[in-house]
C-alpha cells in the first residue's frame, strides 16, 4: 500500500490538534475522554465532508472529463477540500457534546483554538501537491529578504518569481494559534474565543486565497476557500 506524503501531513496535523486539545482543555468543562470521542468522530467526518465538498464543485471533472461519476467514490485517488474540514469539526463537536453531556461552547472553544495547528499542517503539506502557488511578483525586497517564501521559475532566459502562499498560510495559522492561546484567559464567556478565532481565520482566508494562482476549487471566478 502506498503512503502519500500529504497523508503524513494530515496525520501530523490531527495529532497536533488532539494533543493541543488535551493540553488546553478546561478541566472543569470536560474530560480527556471527551477529546478522544471527538477525535474518533472528527476524523471520518472530516474525510467525508472534505471529499463531498470537492466532488460537488468538481462535477464537470468527473462527469465530462473522466466521463465516470462513480470515480467520486474512489477516495484513495485524492481530491479533498480543506474547507470541508470546518463543518466536519463543528458537527463532531456538537455530537461529542451531546454524547458526553458537556458544554458545546466550551468544547468548541478548545476545538477552534487547536484547529489552527491542524490547518497549519494541512497548508504545509500542500507543497507536496503543487498547490498553493501565488501570482507573479516583481523582484525586490521580498524576493531577497524572504527567499523561502518565493518560488523562482526559469522560462528560458526569463525568470519569474511567485509567492509560495501555502507557506504564508501555514505561518499565519501558527501565529493565530499563539495569539489565541495567549488571549484565551481574557475570554471569560464560553464561545467568545471561538467567535474571535473564526472571524480572524475567515478574514485571513479571504486575503490569502486571493493571492493564489493554482486554479484549485474555483466556481467561475470565485475561490471556494474565500467563501
PLM feature segments, named:
Residues 1-227:
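A feature for loop-to-transmembrane-helix boundaries and adjacent hydrophobic helices
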Amino acid at each position: 500500500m502506498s503512503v502519500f506524503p500529504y497523508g503524513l501531513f494530515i496525520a501530523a496535523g490531527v495529532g497536533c490538534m488532539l494533543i493541543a486539545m488535551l493540553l488546553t482543555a478546561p478541566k472543569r468543562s470536560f474530560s480527556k475522554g471527551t477529546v478522544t470521542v471527538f477525535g474518533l468522530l472528527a476524523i471520518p467526518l472530516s474525510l467525508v465532508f472534505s471529499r463531498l465538498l470537492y466532488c460537488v464543485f468538481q462535477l464537470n471533472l468527473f462527469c465530462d472529463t473522466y466521463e465516470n461519476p462513480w470515480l467520486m467514490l474512489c477516495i484513495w485517488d485524492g481530491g479533498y477540500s480543506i474547507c470541508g474540514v470546518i463543518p466536519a469539526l463543528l458537527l463532531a463537536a456538537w455530537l461529542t457534546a451531546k454524547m458526553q453531556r458537556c458544554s458545546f461552547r466550551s468544547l468548541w472553544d478548545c476545538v477552534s483554538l487547536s484547529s489552527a495547528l491542524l490547518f497549519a499542517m494541512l497548508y504545509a503539506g500542500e507543497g507536496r501537491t503543487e498547490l498553493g502557488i501565488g501570482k507573479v511578483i516583481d523582484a525586490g525586497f521580498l524576493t531577497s529578504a524572504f527567499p523561502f517564501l518565493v518560488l523562482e521559475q526559469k522560462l528560458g532566459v526569463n525568470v519569474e518569481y511567485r509567492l509560495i502562499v501555502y507557506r504564508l498560510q501555514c505561518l499565519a495559522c501558527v501565529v493565530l494559534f499563539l495569539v489565541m492561546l495567549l488571549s484565551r484567559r481574557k475570554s471569560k464567556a464560553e464561545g467568545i474565543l471561538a467567535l474571535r478565532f473564526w472571524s480572524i481565520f475567515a478574514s485571513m482566508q479571504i486575503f490569502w486565497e486571493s493571492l493564489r494562482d493554482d486554479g484549485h476549487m474555483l466556481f467561475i471566478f470565485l475561490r471556494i476557500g474565500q467563501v
